[in-house]
């Protein structure tokens, strides 16, 4: 094996491959046709193997990327599958196969990625591709940009699948206020700045408390100390993106607001059912519908993209040095306090979500966390930075990530893609929720610890039912 130029590893990449943290990103892609492995190999040789991160290995101390030659055949695995033995249990076979992979680390003697081709029919696809890469290679935005560079529009095979809008962050001052006099603008600026400083101060104090002692309530979704060493399983559900957009427009909010409202509602109903089951087992089930204990502290770690250009860019633009949409792990976390409780009006969850997200957007919490991790890494080393990153994650309950995907169907070398379900493993949570839009679909993708959560389908059932209840409530009020 030959080696070439060396390049420093980014701060978050150092954290992700530190001792005790081995975070891997996965992308599960369902295809409408059987996958031809030769076509995949040819495409990888032309695209992925030439990418700096996918053709580099880590130095012994994990501080530098070292360019190396890539034998693509070593990274594409096509297991032997006895179709007769599997029968109608294609999805179970795929689930078990992917779960076993979460216990097999990537080979650090070569670039940290592999692709598994499973030509097994399920209810949603004719074949499934399982793409695994170490999170130090790049975050979700980076990996999806790479995926788009390798795919084309199904409707026009000659066009690359660049059907994702580029977006800028919203201005803090409305257009109508900008047209007012200087005095009103000054008052708004002073008030907004004071609120920003106050919110940031409170958020950082809560972060410090979470690092030191503040833990979430132990619930049926809260992980134990050994969660990272347990195998993980994956489950996904496809719901209507159009329904989410209808609610978004009717409630004058963002897609994110709707998704977090749905998530908050569904987890409340799921936990209520779990506590009800426990009371029944203990012989103390009451006739009350609400089985939730009072005062549940339930926080969600939410990933935040730190790039100034928050939409997707062509891969070539992301690889340019000092680009505003650069490749890498340029994201941080904020912690969202979910109100776990039953509401008679499903729209209350949406209103709470909108208020919560508006408050969190007006804070420098995410940027400061990233900055502090960089300083700790530089002064105290990767181990201390990894502990600073992982401690608040361990003390919260779950993590939610939302990624915008292609607005129309894409194909990989003549293989139309049915769905895309991103996820990850190696984290300190028993439940990870990824949400990704694709064409007219929204894919709910769960990574979970089966020793803690035995019924992930019920979480997705609750999300689906919550969406229907919100839409029905808006229809009853004549808002749709």
From Swiss-Prot:
Pathway: Glycerolipid metabolism; triacylglycerol biosynthesis; Lipid metabolism
Disruption phenotype: Normal wax ester loads on leaves.
Record topological domains on the Lumenal side: 215-329, 387-480
Domain of life, source organism: Eukaryota
Keywords: Acyltransferase, Cell membrane, Endoplasmic reticulum, Glycoprotein, Golgi apparatus, Membrane, Stress response, Transferase, Transmembrane, Transmembrane helix
Cystine bridges: none
Pfam families: WS_DGAT_C, WS_DGAT_cat
Transmembrane segments annotated in the record for this chain: 194-214, 330-350, 366-386
Induction: Induced in roots and leaves during drought and salt stresses, and upon abscisic acid (ABA) treatment. Up-regulated in the stem epidermis during active wax synthesis.
GO biological process, any: response to water deprivation
Enzyme Commission number(s) from the entry: 2.3.1.20, 2.3.1.75
Annotated tissue distribution: Expressed in roots, stems, leaves, flowers and siliques.
Catalytic center residues: 135 (proton acceptor)
UniProt GO MF annotations: diacylglycerol O-acyltransferase activity; long-chain-alcohol O-fatty-acyltransferase activity
Protein family: In the N-terminal section; belongs to the long-chain O-acyltransferase family.
Protein name according to UniProt: Wax ester synthase/diacylglycerol acyltransferase 7
Gene symbol of the encoding locus: WSD7
């Amino acid at each position: 094996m030959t080696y070439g130029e060396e390049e420093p590893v980014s701060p978050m990449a150092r954290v992700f491959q530190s001792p005790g943290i081995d975070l891997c990103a996965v992308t599960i892609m369902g295809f409408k046709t059987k996958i031809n492995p030769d076509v995949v190999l040819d495409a990888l040789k032309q695209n992925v193997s030439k990418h700096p991160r996918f053709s580099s290995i880590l130095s012994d101390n994990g501080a530098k990327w070292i360019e190396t030659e890539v034998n693509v055949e070593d990274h594409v695995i096509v297991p032997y599958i006895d179709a007769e033995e599997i029968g109608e249990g294609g999805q179970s076979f795929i689930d078990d196969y992917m779960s076993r992979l979460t216990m097999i680390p990537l080979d650090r003697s070569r670039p940290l990625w592999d692709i598994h081709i499973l030509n097994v029919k399920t209810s949603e696809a004719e074949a499934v591709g399982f793409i695994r890469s170490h999170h130090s290679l790049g975050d979700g935005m980076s990996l999806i940009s790479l995926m788009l560079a390798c795919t084309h529009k199904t409707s026009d095979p000659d066009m690359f699948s660049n059907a994702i809008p580029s977006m800028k962050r919203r201005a803090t001052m409305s257009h109508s206020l900008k047209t007012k006099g200087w005095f009103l603008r000054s008052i708004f600026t002073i008030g907004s700045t004071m609120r920003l400083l106050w919110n940031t101060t409170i958020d950082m104090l809560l972060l410090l408390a979470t690092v030191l002692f503040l833990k979430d309530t132990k619930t049926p979704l809260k992980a134990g100390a050994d969660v990272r060493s347990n195998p993980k399983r994956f489950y996904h559900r496809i719901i209507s993106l159009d329904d989410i957009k209808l609610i978004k427009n009717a409630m004058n909010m963002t897609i994110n607001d709707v998704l977090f409202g749905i998530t908050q509602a569904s987890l409340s109903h799921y936990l209520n059912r779990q506590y009800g089951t426990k009371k029944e087992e203990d012989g103390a089930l009451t006739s009350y519908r609400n089985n939730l204990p009072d005062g549940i502290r339930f926080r969600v770690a939410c990933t935040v993209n730190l790039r100034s250009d928050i939409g997707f860019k062509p891969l070539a633009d992301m690889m340019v040095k000092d680009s505003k949409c650069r490749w890498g792990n340029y994201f941080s976390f904020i912690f969202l306090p979910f109100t776990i409780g039953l509401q008679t009006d499903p729209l209350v969850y949406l209103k709470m979500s909108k208020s919560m997200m508006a408050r969190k957007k007006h804070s420098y919490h995410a940027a400061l966390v990233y900055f502090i991790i960089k300083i700790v890494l530089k002064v105290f080393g990767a181990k201390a930075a990894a502990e600073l990153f992982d401690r608040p994650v361990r003390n919260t309950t779950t993590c939610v990530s939302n990624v915008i995907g292609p607005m129309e169907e894409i194909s990989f070398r003549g293989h139309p893609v049915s769905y895309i379900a991103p996820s990850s493993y190696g984290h300190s949570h028993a439940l990870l929720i990824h949400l990704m839009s694709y064409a007219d679909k929204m894919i709910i993708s769960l990574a979970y610890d089966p020793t803690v959560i035995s019924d992930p389908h019920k979480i997705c059932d609750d999300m689906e039912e919550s969406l229907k209840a919100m839409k029905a409530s808006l229809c009853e009020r004549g808002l749709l």
